[in-house]
A protein has these predicted regions:
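Glycine-rich, aromatic-lined ligand/substrate-binding cores of catalytic
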Residues: 281-315
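Conserved SET/PR-domain catalytic core that frames the SAM/AdoMet-binding pocket
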Residues: 188, 198, 274, 284-298, ...
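Short, surface-exposed charged micro-motifs
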Residues: 119, 240, 291
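Extracellular/periplasmic, surface-exposed regions of secreted and cell-surface proteins
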Residues: 1-226, 362, 366-450
């Protein structure tokens, strides 16, 4: 660390880490970082009065971090004796053989971060601003690469250092404090943006598609991938007149009244896997927070909130309960739906159900029906407290505080899942797989300070 006259600031760190999860010859990694800052307001030529600008700092940093969040010994080949036989001396004998394909050169993931920002304090530090641009480049990402079916091994995927991506955006924060009167308060807000781009998937491929999620080089990671939903066939006329952009009637073999209709994207007159397209993103483009704290004659109130905008979620529980196919549990609305009228026109906004597969189960195709706008604003914490006057206790205790608080009080959202705070995977960021709901909790207590 170096600080010259509180104007020029330098900090540098270098660390060396090793992990037994990585291959022996490359399990050690060196990770440096450096940051610099310049207090522009400390210069003699700074043109604005110190009474107005209390701090004007320009800063920048660069650093490298390592990650090896994988299982143990995934770089080691294993032998299997299960049903491994061969002929020896005109007899069938048991042997061993390599049963899985592994990468013997697993190394550290590397995250290279660049940040440039300014810090500004005004009016005797009452008003503070920060603004920052960031770019994070992740290289040698450890992820599951498909193994060719003709490889002669048991595993379908293998963990390798095979991908790279970039995340960039801006972060802003503002805080205002007023402690000059009996009513004291602090208000703060923060906002960050995100732009994600996959720069490489390795091994001469430009795409990685797994089920309802697709990653393309040059685009966002783990986008939703499926069919464009065009409504429900309410009558035979809807089926007969369902045409593509060329006016050709679209063939959906086995589809009937009450089934979902999809767009013929490639205009070949039929619905198949070639009609799948990117449907949306599971990465929030904007994250924000709003917080407030007030004090008045011993009372204090704190409110903490946060939220996210411009992204979608596929909720596994919701989609399963509202699926039109299978024997598993269903939402009661599947029974309550008014599916037919007296003249045979299908009225429900839910497609017809299948107990067993009969041809194409069209209503279970992954489409826009199965993703939801997950924008939300969550009141995360509210606490009201009172600090009793010290004179009441005459030195027995130095302080007494009573408080009540609530966590996860309410979430403003149209999302129908149980939890907006789910954690998706690297290549499935918008997939909420059975995450537990956030418990709403209330507490009351008294804090004694001696």
């Amino acid at each position: 660390n170096y600080n010259y006259d509180e104007k020029y600031i330098l900090s540098a760190v270098i660390r060396r880490d090793g992990s037994s999860r990585l291959s022996k010859n490359i399990r050690w990694g060196t990770f440096p970082s450096v940051s610099v800052g310049w207090r522009f307001d400390k210069e003699k030529f700074f043109p604005i009065s110190r009474d107005v600008v209390n701090m004007f700092k320009v800063r920048g940093s660069y650093g490298v971090l390592g990650n090896e969040n994988i299982g143990e010994y995934m770089y080691q080949t294993t032998m299997d004796r299960n049903n491994m036989t061969y002929s020896f001396g005109n007899q069938v004998v048991t042997g061993s053989a390599v049963s899985t394909f592994v990468d013997n050169n697993l190394a550290w993931e590397k995250k290279k971060s660049t940040n440039i920002g300014i810090d500004l304090a005004l009016f005797n530090n009452r008003l503070e601003f920060t603004a920052e641009w960031y770019k994070n480049v992740s290289e040698d990402l450890l992820y599951s690469v498909p193994v060719p079916a003709n490889a002669g091994v048991d595993n379908e995927v293998v963990t390798m250092n095979a991908a790279s991506m970039e995340n960039s955006g801006f972060e802003f924060s503002a805080t205002y404090r007023n402690y000059d009167h009996a009513l004291k308060y602090t208000i703060s807000a923060n906002l960050s943006t995100l732009k994600n781009k996959v720069t490489s998937l390795g091994f001469s491929t430009d795409r990685f598609i797994t089920g309802a999620y697709a990653t393309f080089v040059g685009q966002e990671v783990g986008q939703f991938y499926g069919y464009v939903y065009e409504g429900i066939a309410r009558s035979q006329a809807d089926l007969d007149n369902h045409v593509n952009d060329n006016g050709v009637v679209i063939t959906q073999e086995g589809a009937g009244i009450g089934d979902c209709l999809y767009k013929d994207v490639n205009n070949d007159g039929r619905i198949d896997s070639e009609d799948q397209v990117v449907l949306g993103s599971g990465l929030p483009k904007i994250n924000f927070g709003l917080n407030a704290h007030r004090e008045y004659k011993g009372f204090d109130l704190s409110i903490s909130t946060y939220g996210a905008l411009n992204y979608h979620v596929s909720d596994d529980i919701y989609n399963s309960l509202n699926s039109s196919y299978g024997y598993s549990n269903k939402d009661v609305s599947m029974l309550e739906a008014n599916r037919w009228s007296e003249d045979g026109i299908y009225l429900s906004d839910k497609p017809r159900t299948y107990i067993v597969s009969n041809g194409e189960a069209w209503n279970n195709y992954f489409s826009e029906r199965m993703i939801q706008n997950a924008a939300y604003w969550k009141i995360a914490n509210v606490e009201l407290g009172y600090n009793f006057p010290d004179k009441w206790f005459k030195g027995i205790v130095s302080g007494v505080r009573a408080y009540v608080s609530a966590q996860n009080l309410y979430t403003f959202t149209g999302y129908k899942g149980y939890n907006v705070d789910y954690a998706g995977g690297t290549f499935t960021p918008g997939y909420n797989f059975c995450s537990f709901p956030s418990a709403k909790s209330f507490m009351a207590g008294i804090l004694f300070t001696f």
